[in-house]
Amino acid sequence: PKLNISCLMSVSHVILPSVIKEFKTYHPNILIEIYEGVGGFISDAVIDGQVDFGIGSSEFYPKAVSVVDEVEEKFVAVMPKRHNLAKLSAITLQNIGHLPLVSMPPSSGIRQLIDAEALKIGLILNHEITTNQYNTMFNFILAGLGVSIVPVSVVRELDKSQFCVKTIEPVINRKLAVLIRSNQILGDASKQFLKLLLPNLKNIS
């Protein structure tokens, strides 16, 4: 037996290791394959039947997909410890608007949501460097190449002696959800996995 899961990269490396470890203590013989991606990839994999369920953004998903459970996660700004903005207690999009950003690809839900929030106040953000890996993003930040706006979960393991993490005001949240095909009946393995996953997902912020 095998469990196939599509998952946002920003969630997979933070939440899934401990959940999978616990799941395997109960189901050691079930194989698990994780399909990591951004944006519409998660729901596409669900619709195509490539995976049993997806963990992705519920801001943008097609009608062929249903939401099992939903949580909110806030965004934060990440910069080098000695950055000029590090002395501020909180960061606004106006503070960041003129700065070079290190960002996820345009296809990512994160990028789309941030751009939409900026446009509401008449800002077009300067996405000077694009990468699809957080480790690469953080290395670029340390090199002084820019600032990033990321979900708070991805900064849990950052070395706070090198990085400064600041709250963004007004708060920007994204909605995360477990996604399944509409009218899909979950199998026992999926149900057991979600039973372990959902409490962790709710604590993501």
Where is each model-derived feature located?
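Short, well-ordered beta-strand segments
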Residues: K2-S6, G54, V78, V102, ...
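Central regulatory/effector-binding core of bacterial HTH transcription factors
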Residues: P1-P62, T130-T131
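Hydrophobic hinge/microswitch elements
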Residues: V38-V51, G56-S57, S107-C164
